[in-house]
Design a protein with these regions (language model features):
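TPR/TPR-like (Sel1-like) alpha-helical repeat modules
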Residues: 2-17, 57-58, 64, 68-75, ...
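Boundary/linker segments of alpha-helical solenoid repeat arrays
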Residues: 15-26, 78-88, 119-149
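Repeat-mediated protein-protein interaction surfaces in helical alpha-solenoids
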Residues: 24-38, 72-83
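Second-shell loop/turn segments in exported
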Residues: 35-40, 52-63
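Short coil/turn linker motifs that delimit alpha-helical repeat modules in TPR/alpha-solenoid proteins
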Residues: 41-44, 87
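"A position-specific structural signal for the A-helix of alpha-solenoid helical repeats
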Residues: 45-55, 59, 90-104, 136, ...
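A mature extracytoplasmic/lumenal domain signature
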Residues: 53, 70, 168-170
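Short loop/turn and low-complexity linker motifs enriched in small/turn-promoting residues
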Residues: 147-174
């Protein structure tokens, strides 16, 4: 995982390098060939780098490192959405992953906000919110005593998956 972390750090530096966004390179590409232009990552690729970095740190059992990447990802998401909100969709998986890290760190307020944003992002996407994610988010918010947040999601109390239905009928928690 250490090598993966280093490689993603290099990729991020390359992406942030002013040379890759050079006006001279753009002008040369217009006059000659597009292949002269250095590759620039698309917004979803930038966010994917953060997803993998968070997963790398979690795999190493380095919660502090994962939390740093979560905070960096939040800054990157905000920057991307402010730059071009019409072209950039909210990233439900990254929001959900961030919520999990906040939850593991005991930062319940940040976790609740991230869970809420994850559900909203999934709902607004073509993919939709997986029932299992909604189950987990609902139970996490309930555990945090955030019934108002659950109601604000405008979803039924528990998603109708076989596991949730069986557990609900038995009167147990997930």
């Amino acid at each position: 995982f250490d090598e993966s972390i280093k490689n993603f750090e290099k990729a991020e530096k390359i992406n942030d390098d002013p040379y890759t966004k050079s006006v001279t390179n753009e002008a040369a590409a217009i006059l000659t060939n597009d292949n002269i232009r250095p590759y620039r990552a698309r917004p979803f690729e930038i966010l994917t780098m953060y997803e993998f970095q968070i997963l790398n740190y979690l795999a190493k059992m380095d919660l502090d490192g994962a939390l740093v990447e979560v905070k960096r990802s939040q800054i990157a998401m905000n920057r991307l959405y402010q730059k071009d909100a019409d072209k950039v969709n909210d990233n439900g998986f990254l929001r959900y992953l961030s919520a999990l890290v906040y939850d593991l760190e005991g930062e319940q307020d940040d976790a609740a906000i991230a869970y809420y944003k994850a559900v909203k992002a999934y709902d607004e996407s073509k993919m939709g919110l997986p029932n299992e994610v909604f189950e987990f988010v609902t139970e996490s918010l309930r555990r945090m005593d955030r019934e108002d947040d659950i109601r604000a999601l405008k979803k039924k109390e528990l998603a109708s998956t076989p596991k949730a239905t069986a557990v609900q009928e038995m009167g147990q928690e997930i």
